[in-house]
UniProtKB/Swiss-Prot annotation:
Gene that produces this protein: G3
Record protein name field: I-Kappa-B like protein G1
Organism whose genome encodes this protein: Microplitis demolitor bracovirus (isolate Webb) (MdBV)
GO molecular function, one term: NF-kappaB binding
InterPro entries to which the protein is assigned, alphabetical: Ankyrin_rpt, Ankyrin_rpt-contain_sf, NF-kappa-B_inhibitor
UniProt keywords, alphabetically: ANK repeat, Host-virus interaction, Inhibition of host NF-kappa-B by virus, Repeat
Gene Ontology BP annotations: cellular response to tumor necrosis factor; symbiont-mediated suppression of host NF-kappaB cascade; toll-like receptor 4 signaling pathway
Length: 176
């Protein structure tokens, strides 16, 4: 009964548990869909959860996209239904979900995002790159085709000198 009481009031989900954020961020990162669905009433009572950043400048949608590739679409779809911003940017590089999908080679997420009304298909991050630029630099023909076929902005990036500092920056394994 005590466990159900904690779940109902949501305190366990909104308190910081470590430097990586709170339990809600953990569920977005590594939890299963049932945990996220069960948490929906707590989220609806605490909508600010959807917009809080973790220690690396990521919101819940960015965390799901980057760390739970196999469940990213389902998690993000639920989070957006609950009120998350599908076009939000993480704070480190200004990447959107589409940038993250290109960087993690999450073809399913990229295709879903491209077909979702309201998604900024030509969003430019802080390094002046679109999702297509990331796929182009990684020579990921499959991702480039998904973006091209689904109407994303697909201009070939200007070749940048390899010694340029910005070309070697990375974000948790997502070199952009």
């Amino acid at each position: 009964m005590a466990e159900n009481e904690h779940f109902r009031n949501g305190i366990d989900y909104v308190e910081l548990v470590n430097q990586e954020g709170h339990t809600f961020h953990y569920i977005c990162r590594a939890g299963n869909m049932n945990e996220l669905v069960d948490m929906a009433p707590v989220i609806l009572r605490n909508l600010d959860l959807l917009f809080q950043y973790d220690h690396e400048g990521r919101q819940c949608t960015h965390i799901a996209a980057e760390y739970d590739v196999s469940n990213a679409v389902m998690k993000i779809e639920l989070l957006v239904m609950l009120g998350a911003d599908i076009n939000s940017r993480e704070l480190k590089f200004g990447n959107t979900l589409l940038h993250i999908a290109a960087g993690t080679e999450n073809y399913q997420l990229a295709e879903w995002l491209c077909k979702k009304p309201g998604v900024e298909l030509g969003a430019i991050n802080f390094l002046y790159k679109t999702a297509y630029h990331i796929a182009y630099e990684r020579q990921n023909a499959r991702m480039m085709e998904i973006l091209r076929v689904n109407g994303a902005v697909c201009d070939d990036p200007i070749d940048i000198d390899e010694s340029d500092e910005t070309s070697s920056e990375s974000n948790e394994g997502i070199s952009i």
